[in-house]
């Protein structure tokens, strides 16, 4: 637990510094920064009466702000910022939620009217819990800076009503090891920070945003434990994107897996995301839209394609945990300052909406947890699905600049935009369905699988040595990728289920699908799942052509 004073305090003149820096954001003249200035000046008047003096003029400026956005925060910067925030404000608590490959503790600020930062205290509050994550790719640093700025605003008394309904879990630096591997050439054409940024993978060489299902990294296991113990209702994952030269300052995505609970998809697509987009446009004059890149496939016309439905990705994984997840992708070719502000504005509007709709958020999550998926036909594989009609996409342009230190070419967003109508591939349609069983039987000798299931928070129970009618998957063939990905050669199994009977052996465990994580369990254990344990090769030694998949199941009707 962090040290706390008796009341929230924040140096008044530092709030003024923040106003001046934000007012320079290009394209915002007379809009967002003006209203933001008025709000912060009101905070100045309030905080000027506080009896605490700042230790320095830069006490709560981020490294990005102190260096005029030439640099980004180090791991030590972030830890120090969060610890000092906890020492200054009674509503900010400092803790950690795990470790990196190289042993760095993963810092977490827990913000709200709670007694301490423990999962028990947070869950006992009965409030909506929101997890905010930055820096899963350590070259994409805008979220790391924006979350520190958000904390500072909360300390200054802004958004005080959020504490009535929410507890925030703020994790600015998830890929902490990658963050410390700074070079001037990481993310080559990204426009700043010119002083360098970290690398995409962690210290093991893993892309942490592909590790949520196989959880081979300590970081992925740490965040899975956080999801299980704190059980946030909403999660926001903050990135920077590049690719297509569009005119959006930020693009976003809900969970994309077809097995995402429909109520979560509707809440985001029909409610939160359109509302937030409109608020950003009205307040700041910037356009946001669904994540995508414009390109042509097979010689056809260009279309707007989202990324991938598989739950190895953070927001898709969280959707299969029955939670509301949002991906944020600030535009790489905007200036570093604009990317940070675009991310900050996005998070603020999300939190405003969640605050106003807290009862609905908690009900959607509770209903998804209570609903059994046993007997449902869920997707094992999927393909992008074309929109019924073309949509208007705002395209843009860039100008090339030279990196001031290396001379390498950089791209800078130009203040131009035009509309191009194209089909959108923003959702996914199942290509292979399977009925969810009642339960899976995992043999005792598959200890690694049992350990990984437990790491995800899946509930397991001992199997009694009583004969039971089951289905076993008979393997017709196995296709193995020639090249490794994430250190593993992915595998595709072909075959079909056959009825038979087994008697569980000592140590065998049941994983029942009638549990809140039933959707996730299904994707992890089904042999033909495109992102399950079989896909990642964890069962390769047990697979034989003509043999059976070692994990059997009780059919779901």
Predicted segments — roles?
Residues 23-25, 35:
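Serine residues within intrinsically disordered or low-complexity segments
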Residues 16, 36-38, 50-557:
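Structured catalytic-domain cores with a bias toward divalent-metal coordination
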Residues 40-47:
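Sec-dependent N-terminal signal peptides
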């Amino acid at each position: 637990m962090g040290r706390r004073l008796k009341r929230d305090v924040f140096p008044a003149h530092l709030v003024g510094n923040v106003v001046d820096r934000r007012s320079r954001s290009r394209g915002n003249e007379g809009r967002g920064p003006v209203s933001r200035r008025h709000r912060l000046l009101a905070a100045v008047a309030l905080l000027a009466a506080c009896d605490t003096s700042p230790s320095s003029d830069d006490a709560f400026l981020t490294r990005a702000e102190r260096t005029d956005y030439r640099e980004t925060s180090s791991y030590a910067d972030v830890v120090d910022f969060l610890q000092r925030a906890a020492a200054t404000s009674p509503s900010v608590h400092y803790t950690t939620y795990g470790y990196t490959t190289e042993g760095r503790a993963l810092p977490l600020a827990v913000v709200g009217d709670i007694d301490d930062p423990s999962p028990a205290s947070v869950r006992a509050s009965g409030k909506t819990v929101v997890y905010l994550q930055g820096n899963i790719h350590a070259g994409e640093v805008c979220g790391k800076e924006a979350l520190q700025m958000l904390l500072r605003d909360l300390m200054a008394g802004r958004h005080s009503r959020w504490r009535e309904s929410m507890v925030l879990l703020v994790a600015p630096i998830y890929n902490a090891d990658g963050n410390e591997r700074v070079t001037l050439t990481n993310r080559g054409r990204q426009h700043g920070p010119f002083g360098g940024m970290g690398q995409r993978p962690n210290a093991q060489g893993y892309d942490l945003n592909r590790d949520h299902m196989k959880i081979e990294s300590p970081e992925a296991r740490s965040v899975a434990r956080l999801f299980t113990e704190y059980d946030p209702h909403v999660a926001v994952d903050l990135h920077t994107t590049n690719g297509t030269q569009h005119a959006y300052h930020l693009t976003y995505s809900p969970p994309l897996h077809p097995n995402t609970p429909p109520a979560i998809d509707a809440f985001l697509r029909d409610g939160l995301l359109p509302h937030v987009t409109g608020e950003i446009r009205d307040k700041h004059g910037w356009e946001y839209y669904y994540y995508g890149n414009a390109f042509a496939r097979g010689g056809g016309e260009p279309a707007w394609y989202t990324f991938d439905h598989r739950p190895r990705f953070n927001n898709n994984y969280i959707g299969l945990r029955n939670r509301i997840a949002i991906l944020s992708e600030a535009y790489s070719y905007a200036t570093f300052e604009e990317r940070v502000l675009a991310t900050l504005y996005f998070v603020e509007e999300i939190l405003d909406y969640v605050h106003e709709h807290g009862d609905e958020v908690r009900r959607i999550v509770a209903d998804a947890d209570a609903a059994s998926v046993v007997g449902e036909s869920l997707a094992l594989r999927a393909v992008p699905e074309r929109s019924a009609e073309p949509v208007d996409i705002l395209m843009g342009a860039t100008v090339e600049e030279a990196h001031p230190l290396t001379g390498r070419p950089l791209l800078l967003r130009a203040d131009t935009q035009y509309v191009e109508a194209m089909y959108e591939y923003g959702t996914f349609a199942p290509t292979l369905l399977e009925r969810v069983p009642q339960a899976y039987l995992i043999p005792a000798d598959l200890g690694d699988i049992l350990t990984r299931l437990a790491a995800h928070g899946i509930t397991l129970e001992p199997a009694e040595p009583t004969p039971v009618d089951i289905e076993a998957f008979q393997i017709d063939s196995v296709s193995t990728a020639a090249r490794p990905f994430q250190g593993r050669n992915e595998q595709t199994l072909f075959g079909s289920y056959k009825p038979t009977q087994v008697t569980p052996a000592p140590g065998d465990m049941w994983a029942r699908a009638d549990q809140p994580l039933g959707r996730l369990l299904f994707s992890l254990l089904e042999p033909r799942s495109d992102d399950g344990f079989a896909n990642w090769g964890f069962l390769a030694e047990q697979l034989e052509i003509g043999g059976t998949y070692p994990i059997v199941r009780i059919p779901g009707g």
